[in-house]
A protein has these predicted regions:
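GST-like domain detector, emphasizing the conserved glutathione-binding G-site
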Residues: 1-137, 141
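A generic structural-conservation signal
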Residues: 31, 163, 188, 210-211
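Positions that flank functional sites
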Residues: 36-37, 165, 216
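Active-site-flanking alpha-helical
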Residues: 77, 175-176, 211
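GST-like fold's C-terminal all-alpha helical module
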Residues: 101-203
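C-terminal helix/juxtamembrane-tail motif
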Residues: 206-217
Length: 217
C-alpha cells in the first residue's frame, strides 16, 4: 500500500494541482476518489479525518496529513527534492523569485481566473446555470492586465520562476485548462510569450496523466 494518498476529485482544480505535482515527482501513490456529487467531502468522517473545511484535496504521507493544495505541492517538492522533476530551486535567490511568482499566481491570477472559470465552466456544466455576464465583463479586463505583466515577465524568462519549470508554473495548469475552453482563451492567445509558455507547460506528460483521470470520473 502506498504511503502517499491523495483524496479528491479529478474535476477539482485544487486536486489536479496536487496530482500533477505527484506525477512530476514520479511518486508511488494512491488516488482516493471523493464523490463530491453526494457531498462526501462535507460528511463528518471526511471533516474529522481529512479536511475540517470540507474541501478537496486532502493528502497523506504516512502519519502526515495535509490540506490546501499549494501547501501540499510545496511539501512534496521539498520532501522529495531528489525525485523526478526539480520543482523548486536550491539557490535561495532563485527560489525567492520563484516564490514571488507562486504568490502572484495565488493572489493575483487565481483570484480572477477562478471567478471566470466558475461563471463560464462550472455553472453551465455542473449546475445548468447561465454565466453572470456582469461578473465575466468585470473580470475579463482584470485578467488581461495580469496577463500583460506575465507577457513582460515571459519575454525575459522561459518560465515564471526562471529558466526551469517550477511550482510557479505548475500551479496555473488547472485553471488554464478550464479557461481554454471558453471565450477567455483569446486573452492568452493574443500574447505570444504567454501563449508559448502555456503550450509548453500544458504538454507536460505529468499534467496529461493528471487530466487522464477525468475520463475515469
Amino acid at each position: 500500500m502506498a504511503a502517499i494518498k491523495v483524496h479528491g476529485s479529478p474535476l477539482s482544480t485544487n486536486t489536479l494541482r496536487v496530482l500533477a505535482t505527484v506525477y512530476e515527482k514520479e511518486l508511488d501513490h494512491e488516488f482516493v476518489l471523493v464523490d463530491m456529487s453526494i457531498g462526501e467531502h462535507k460528511k463528518e468522517h471526511f471533516l474529522s479525518t481529512h479536511n475540517p473545511f470540507g474541501q478537496v484535496p486532502a493528502f497523506e504521507d504516512g502519519d502526515l496529513k495535509l490540506f490546501e493544495s499549494r501547501a501540499i505541492t510545496r511539501y512534496i517538492a521539498c520532501e522529495y527534492a531528489d525525485k523526478g522533476t526539480q520543482l523548486i530551486y536550491q539557490d535561495s535567490k532563485k527560489m525567492a523569485i520563484t516564490s514571488v511568482w507562486m504568490e502572484v499566481e495565488g493572489q493575483q491570477y487565481e483570484q480572477i481566473a477562478a471567478k471566470l472559470a466558475w461563471e463560464l465552466v462550472y455553472k453551465p456544466l455542473l449546475l445548468g446555470m447561465s454565466a453572470d455576464k456582469a461578473i465575466v465583463e468585470e473580470n475579463e479586463p482584470k485578467l488581461a492586465k495580469v496577463l500583460d505583466i506575465y507577457e513582460s515577465r515571459l519575454a525575459q524568462s522561459k518560465y515564471l520562476g526562471g529558466d526551469c519549470f517550477t511550482l510557479a508554473d505548475l500551479h496555473h495548469l488547472p485553471t488554464l485548462h478550464y479557461l481554454f475552453g471558453t471565450q477567455v482563451k483569446k486573452l492568452f492567445d493574443s500574447r505570444p510569450h504567454v501563449s508559448a509558455w502555456i503550450a509548453d507547460i500544458t504538454a507536460r506528460p505529468a499534467w496529461l496523466k493528471a487530466l487522464a483521470l477525468q475520463s475515469q470520473e
